[in-house]
Amino acid sequence: MVAQPKGKSAILEKHDDDVVIVAALRSPMTRGKKGGLSQCCPEEMLGQVLKGVVAQSKIDPKLIDDIAVGNVLPPGGGATVARMAALWAGIPNTTALNTLNRQCSSGLAATNQIANEIKTGQIDIGIGAGVESMTQNYGAGVMPEKMSDAVMENEEASDCLAPMGITSENVAAEYNITRDVQDQFAAESYQKAAAAQKAGKFKSEIVTIKYEDEDGNERVIDTDDGIREGVTKESLSKLKPAFSKTGSTTAGNASQVSDGAAAVLLARRSVAKKLGLPIIGKFVQAAVVGVPPRVMGIGPAFAIPRVLELTGLSNDDIDIFEINEAFASQAVYSVQKAGIDPKKVNPVGGAIAMGHPLGCTGARQIATGLAEAKRENKKLIVTSMCIGTGMGMASVIVNEQ
């Protein structure tokens, strides 16, 4: 195995065997049940984003070797919908595809799978993607009716079934993350996202989605519709706890139930150069760690140091941290525990304001991070998220735009 280059100067060097990012795009993130994509089937949503990365990169679809799609709530048997999306997008049947589910990191796990296939010489070009229609597939029905009594006697095993909101309350209680601090963090997420949207900052990363709704009308969706203007800590403080009468997690300081898709087109640098493909970034490394299921939200606090250790980088080397805001409680704790400068975190807002389509988020963060890095002339990006059942994942990406 080739040794991973370590340290900032080594990471920024360019080599023919690097895994580079050729395109990274997403759909709008829209509200579950009532947002712009609530009547759009996930295969059509994902298919249009796949078309977007192919069109932007100008790649011949026949050259795409493999596609991995993150999807947590699989409709139609999981792989079926994603395969349909790729074929409909004009990608030939000779291109392989799989879906995977590592909960909230599925989009990043898919991207990492493709990156590793390129690193090991299995393929030259591939797409890591993610899609979720929480409108269609989220709810009580996704949980099994019967679980093994023997397994449920194990405390940590049974904790895997804890509602995510309860795990947020556990984090807040165990690590003393107050309601006031959570509401302040959430308000800032909304404020940053609203300012970014008003300035048109998301346009370059969004693929407009067109589809026919249930009434036969054509819908054209080109904007995130969960972002709200005028949100303050004071307005959020009026909301009631959502999961426990005495709790601190509310609908206002937790991520939104959303619909969306994202895709990242990756290639070996030598191949991208030979084909004249645009190179916008480099996928350096990813890391995944386990944490107690009852406080699953603390995952980024341990995944980020791990990926920095693997790459020989420090917090000071990183310009942008895209940390998923599943809940304000866990995001605040993770930033504090990992010793990250809050000013570097989610500069254009996060999932509290924009939404968290489960399988999509890991790929969406890459698109958002690279777009922001290009605007601000920044180099190093870390993306990270907590993962249901107790894990965290993180990646290091170089902006080359």
Regions found by a protein language model. Name each.
Residues 9-11, 27-51, 55, 73-75, ...:
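Active-site pocket-shaping loop/turn-to-helix segments
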Residues 71-125, 159-166, 230-256, 337-365, ...:
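Conserved catalytic cysteine-centered active-site region
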Residues 122-175:
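Flexible glycine-/small-residue-enriched beta->alpha junction loops
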